From Swiss-Prot:
Keywords: Ribonucleoprotein, Ribosomal protein, RNA-binding, rRNA-binding. NCBIfam families: rplD_bact. It comes from the Bacteria. The keyword Zinc-finger does not apply. One of its GO terms (molecular function) is structural constituent of ribosome. Signal peptide: none annotated. Residues 58-70 have a biased composition (Basic residues). It comes from Burkholderia cenocepacia (strain HI2424). The keyword Transport does not apply. This is Large ribosomal subunit protein uL4. Part of the 50S ribosomal subunit. GO terms for cellular component: ribonucleoprotein complex; ribosome. GO terms for biological process: translation.
Length: 206
């Protein structure tokens, strides 16, 4: 698979030969959906909670006698049928939202995403991204020159200047190959991968 190599002006020059196993795989929508949903589910904190009829603070006194009033029978005001009563099936912090995805499926899903990004022209390779100082303006000007507004940068090692300069830019993220997740790959309009990171991705996923 040939990947486009961009220069500092965002123009396409030479090409980089990449592994077909990682960047030339068929598009598998069902697998990608499963991998993305599992990633989102595993990121949930599970901190939502409601109270059931046992946990709400209400008196246990019977509101009125069982018979003779003409009203519907009632046992206590904490009943789920009453306003302010407990929930029937409340959410609990102990809920487990995690989804298990096998390593082979996870790798195959990432390969399918990388391959589709390459086919759509959303994935490009750069020699390296080097900043002389940790200045957000320097990085913003570089992206403006390259015509980028929403970009995920995958680099072999995260340079401190690059990391500090990118923190205040919206729709910009910088990660190492081992931390590339399926949701970020799909979310950003453009994915820039350094030459050294391409080799690391191939080593991780092939």
């Amino acid at each position: 698979m040939e990947l486009k190599l961009l220069n500092e002006n965002g123009q396409e020059g030479a090409v980089v030969n990449a592994s077909d196993v990682v960047f030339g795989r068929d598009y598998n929508e069902a697998l990608i959906h499963q991998v993305v949903v599992a990633y989102q589910a595993n990121a949930r904190q599970g901190n939502r909670a409601q109270k059931d009829r046992e946990q709400v603070k209400h008196t246990t006194k019977k509101p009125w006698r069982q018979k003779g009033t003409g009203r519907a029978r009632a046992g206590m005001s904490s009943s789920p049928l009453w306003r302010g009563g407990g929930r029937i099936f409340p959410n609990s912090p102990e809920e487990n939202f995690s989804h298990k995805v096998n390593k082979k499926m996870h790798r195959a899903g990432l390969c399918s995403i990388f391959s589709q990004l390459a086919r759509e022209g959303r994935l490009s390779v750069v020699e390296d991204i080097i900043l002389e100082a940790p200045k957000t303006k320097l990085l913003a000007d570089k992206f403006k020159t390259m015509g980028l507004d929403s970009v995920l940068i995958i680099t072999d090692t995260v340079d401190e200047n690059l990391y500090l300069a990118s923190r205040n830019l919206p729709h910009v993220a910088i990660v190492e190959p081992r931390y590339a997740d399926p949701l970020s790959l799909i979310y950003f309009k453009k994915v820039l991968v350094t030459k050294a990171a391409v080799a690391q991705i191939e080593e991780l996923l092939s």
